[in-house]
Structures are given as C-alpha cells and as structure tokens.
C-alpha cells in the first residue's frame, strides 16, 4: 500500500474530524466521493477534506493532498474508508469527503484545521 499521509494524525483528532463530518452532514453540506471532493477543493469551497488511507490503488486519491495544499484547504487522513463512508451517511465505503458548509460543526472544523496546521 502506498503511503499517502505526509504527517501523523493523532487518533483523537481523527475521531473529532469524523464527529465534525457527521454534524456537518446533518446541519450543513458535504461532498461525497473523490470527484465531488476534488471539485469542491478546486472551487475553494472545501472547509475540511477527509481522505481514507486504505484506498487501493492509492492513485485514486493521490492528487487530493497536493491540491488541498495548493488551494489552502485543510485535509486529514482517516485510517478506514468504511468509517469515512459511515460518517458520511453512506452504506458503503468512501474514499474522500469534503465539508463544504460545516453548519453547526463550524467551530469544530476551525479547531481541527488549526490543529492540522500545527502538525504539518
């Protein structure tokens, strides 16, 4: 498996990101799937991008990290694509999700973004 993550994310922060995703899903707006997330990042709409680490082949999501950095969108790696899919409200696994409107999770997303910046 290719190593996608450029930095280690504490499990506590990963769990907080999944919690923020669930809240944003219910009170805001999210984009599910690599194509939708890519469009949100390119348009500058992504507040937080969640990328599954266990994607095969890794090339499917390899562009997300560099694109997020270019567009100044915070991104975090989630260990398991099934967890990401479940938090997105999908019954299947998901490679990438972008939070476009955080809704009631706005403060959480901002806090996560600041902590991610400190990790890099």
From Swiss-Prot:
Coiled coil: none annotated. It is found in: Cytoplasm. Keywords: Cytoplasm, Ribonucleoprotein, Ribosomal protein, RNA-binding, rRNA-binding, tRNA processing. InterPro entries: Ribosomal_eL30-like_sf, Ribosomal_eL8-like_CS, Ribosomal_eL8/eL30/eS12/Gad45, Ribosomal_eL8/Nhp2, Ribosomal_eL8_arc. The keyword rRNA-binding applies. HAMAP family: Ribosomal_eL8. Multifunctional RNA-binding protein that recognizes the K-turn motif in ribosomal RNA, the RNA component of RNase P, box H/ACA, box C/D and box C'/D' sRNAs. Part of the 50S ribosomal subunit. Probably part of the RNase P complex. This is Large ribosomal subunit protein eL8. The lineage of its organism: Archaea, Methanobacteriati, Methanobacteriota, Stenosarchaea group, Methanomicrobia.
């Amino acid at each position: 498996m290719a190593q996608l993550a450029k930095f280690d994310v504490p499990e506590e922060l990963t769990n907080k990101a999944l919690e923020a995703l669930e809240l944003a899903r219910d009170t805001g707006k999210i984009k599910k799937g690599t194509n939708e997330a890519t469009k949100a990042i390119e348009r500058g709409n992504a507040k937080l991008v969640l990328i599954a680490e266990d994607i095969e082949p890794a090339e499917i999501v390899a562009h997300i990290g560099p694109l997020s950095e270019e567009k100044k969108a915070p991104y975090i790696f989630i260990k398991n694509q099934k967890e990401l899919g479940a938090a997105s409200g999908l019954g299947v696994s998901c490679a990438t999700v972008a939070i476009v409107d955080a809704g009631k999770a706005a403060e959480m997303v901002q806090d996560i973004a600041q902590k991610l910046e400190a990790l890099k």
